[in-house]
Amino acid sequence: INRKLDAMNNITIDDMKALQTENYNIKAEFAKDILLKTDESKLSADEKKYFDIYRSWNLRNDPQEKGATVFAVWWKELEKAIWSDEIDKSGLPLPWPNEATLVESLHKDSAYHFLDNINTPSKETLEDDLLASLKKITDTLKIVEANGNLEWAKFKGTKVQHLLKIPALSRLHLPIGGGNGIINATKEDHGPSWRMIVELSSPTEAWGVYPGGQSGNAGSKYYDNFIDLWAAGKYFKLWFMHEGDRLDKKIKWTMKFEKG
């Protein structure tokens, strides 16, 4: 966010809309030179295929990007290869270190202690872990691709669930990008929902949207009519009421409270 703001001048409403829906993956940017150390000569045809998809990826988690899926699956498996032998063996419910910690450590130390698998007699290196993790995920990616889900939005499967998690009353498989560690932090079922931008002009103006609707009746067209607009990064102009608006025709009813 700071990088984006530093590059902006005379920021407009459209600039802020673009910022709130920004899908650039800065974690992937910092990790790319690490993953590109993979020895391509040791890859099978299928492994090379997914490596090339990743290498040509533009580092954006846009809905149609396949490289974002390869990166997410590969990075998760690489983390497992590096951390699980030591941490899981402790027998304690310890969390793995932060992803940024791993990226920083691998940049600073190519012989990072945790690269070695303590359960094998050999001493594994970064190259070994990169190869092993990519080989391990290739079959998974082949299945994902065969099911037509290699594009990021289809793989991520963002959904807006009913409070009772009833699928028929939920909206599933939304075509939206973003993800963990991205400004648009939309994950499978969590992330930024209500988006709002307020311009402190005179008069004050505001824009907003949320993934839902204005009716709780699942049979109403207003039950979920904002969701597609939200997924597409669209906004509504909000009505910022002033004292003289109390008789405006847009007001459908009023509520008066009296002491009992």
Mark where each language-model region is.
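C-terminal/peripheral segments of proteins
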Residues: 2-260
